[in-house]
Every structure is written in structure tokens, then in C-alpha cells.
Amino acid sequence: MANIAERNNSGQYYVNTRLGVAKTKKEEDFPEFVEGSEVHKLLTDLIEVNAKGFRGVVVTALTGLHLNEHYDPLNDFYGCNPRSIFEGGIWYALQENGVPCGKSDPLNVAKNANQLNEDWAQGRRPQSAATAVVRYLRLVIEAKRNKRARLIDYFFFRLWKFSQTISDFRLAEIKSSDYSRQTQGNKLVDFTLKYPESGNLPQYLIAQLLSGLFRTSKIDVVGGDESVFGTNTTSKKPADIWLEIDGNLINLYEVTVKPISLKRLDDSLDALHSTGHLNYPITFICRIDLDVKDLNISNGSLYYKKKKFDFVDYKYFCLSVFSLLSDDEFSIVLKNVASFVKDKNISIKTKSGWNEFFEGES
């Protein structure tokens, strides 16, 4: 165990050191990698994308090479124990330096593939980012010592530069008192539907609305804000969000803006069964017109494997709760969602989307 902790600490120190060096550099310090060069384009394709995992794969591979010069990330990616060194070391270094990342980025992208090659890249999205990972790591592995060091330094410089672009992004401010409650509610809901951020934004909005609705009551709202910040754990949850009174669960909610299949219901049943909540009411908050086409729903409900599932429309649910909130609670919801979007782990695409909807309301 001590060896594992020591290795993870070494990985964390390595990434911290490389990013520390990157902060002292400028683009002019890398004349061989000017815009239009192969390496510049490869790093643009793998770093400046919404998917965080490709950056995580490369950081993990470079850290593995630092810890073991015989490590071959292209043919034995899992040979460096990527989960351990990323979650136990690299992740902390990235967080400390404000670099966007998830808790298990490299594993989410590698998907148990030991070989990172063109065949692997074809199954990833975006494929251009995956291909860039393969080609860049190939350049690193084949390079002589000095060239390898330059390639690695430039990667961390570009990674740091990208993180600064995100942290410096100016998000439009909105004032809840200046516009109709339903007007702003509609815009906020439409924003979360157009830029769902892998489903995190709709889930977060629902959690905030429920929290605002029940803030002065004995009901506690649990869940809804973990995954985007990399704080999710492997422990099983009964649902995305649930309500409790004095620690006793009363209602469960699944929030999705993707089509719901029977497999999705099976997954829900498994979660309910494994957590001992099979007899509690559960509601799917979804896009009724799009997400339940493959289900034989009647009057908003479906009995499946002796379990009743209820379904309500995401937009109607949100707008109804907006109408029930006080002015103060409405303002809190807007402020919290804006803070959520401002977080470094939210993509530039989604931040730009926020400004698309709310620019001019400040």
C-alpha cells in the first residue's frame, strides 16, 4: 500500500511540476510548434474539446512514462495502473491548477482498451481527438530525449493555456427582477435542453428547483450536483435525486433528456433493489414528446416488472416549480445555475451557450 501511495504522490508531484513550468512559458518559447504545425494541430484536437477524457489519457500516459521509462502507453495503457495514479494523484494536481477534469477521465475514454491505436480511435467520439491522442503519444515515444522533453513541455503549456481560457471566460449575468418569471424560466429550461452538458445541467436545475421549493420545510433534497465536479463515488445511489424527511426517503427522481429504453428501466430497478428502495415511488423527469416513444405509457405511468414508473415532462415540471418559488428562491436558483455553468469543468461550448441565451440581460 505504501508503494502505491508513493507512486501516486510522485505522479501528482510530476504533473504539478510540469504545470508549474508551463505557467512560466509563452507561445514564442516553442518556435518549432507554430500554428499550422503537426504538433500544434494534434494538441488543438485533443485538448480544446468538450470531452475531458482525452486530455486525461495523455496526462496519465506521460505520467506513466515518467514513473517507468519502459512503460508503453500505446500497447499496454493499463500497465501503469491508470485508475490509481489518476484518481490518487494526477486528479489532485489538475484540480490544484484549475485544469478541467473528471474523476476518472482516462478510464472513461480508454474503456478497458489496452492498445491505443487507430482501431481504438474509430470507436471514440470525437474521433479526431482520439486520433490526435494516438499520433501525439506515438511522436513522444519515438522521439529522442531532448525532442521528447519539448513535446511534453508543449503539451502541458497548451493544457495550462486552455485552462486559462476557461477560467477567464466572461459569463453573462442575469437579474431575476427585470424579467417575467416564466420568460426567464423558459429561457433557462431551453438553455439546459440545448446544452445539457451530458445531462448534468438538467439534473442540477431540477435539484435546485426542488431545494428552493422545500428549503423552509422539513424535506431535504439529496443528489443532483455531484458528477460534473468529479466528486461522484462508486457507491450505488437509488436515483439521481431523492427527497428525505429526517433521513427517511420519501420520493425518488430520475432526470434524463435522452430516450428511455427498457434497459434504462432495468438499470433503475437494479439500483432500487440494491439500495433497498424498490417499494418507494419513482418518477422520471424527461422530455415526454421525445424520450418515452418506445415505452407503452398510459396516463403518465408504466408498470414494468411489477414496478410502477411515473413520467412527467421536464419543461412543464420546471416551469410549474418556477411559478411556486418566492422571488428570493427564484433568484437563488438563477445564481446557483450560473455558478454551476461558470465552473471550470463546464465546457466552453456550454458557457458560450449561456451567453447566447442571456447576453444583454445584465
Question: For each predicted feature, which ranges?
Answer:
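Catalytic core segments in nucleotide and nucleic-acid processing enzymes
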Residues: 204-362
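Interdomain/boundary linker segments immediately adjacent to catalytic/signaling cores
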Residues: 2-53, 135-204
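A general boundary/transition motif marking the beginning of the first structured unit of a protein
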Residues: 121-124, 143, 176, 198, ...
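"Short basic amphipathic alpha-helical interaction patches in structured regions
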Residues: 77-81, 153-154, 268-269
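Terminal, charged accessory segments of proteins
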Residues: 1-138
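Short, mixed-charge, low-aromatic patches
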Residues: 14-16, 88-92, 107-113, 159-168, ...
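A diffuse structural propensity rather than consistent per-protein peaks
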Residues: 81, 180-181, 261-263
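Short, charged/polar micro-motifs that form catalytic or ligand-binding hotspots
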Residues: 119-126, 192-200, 258
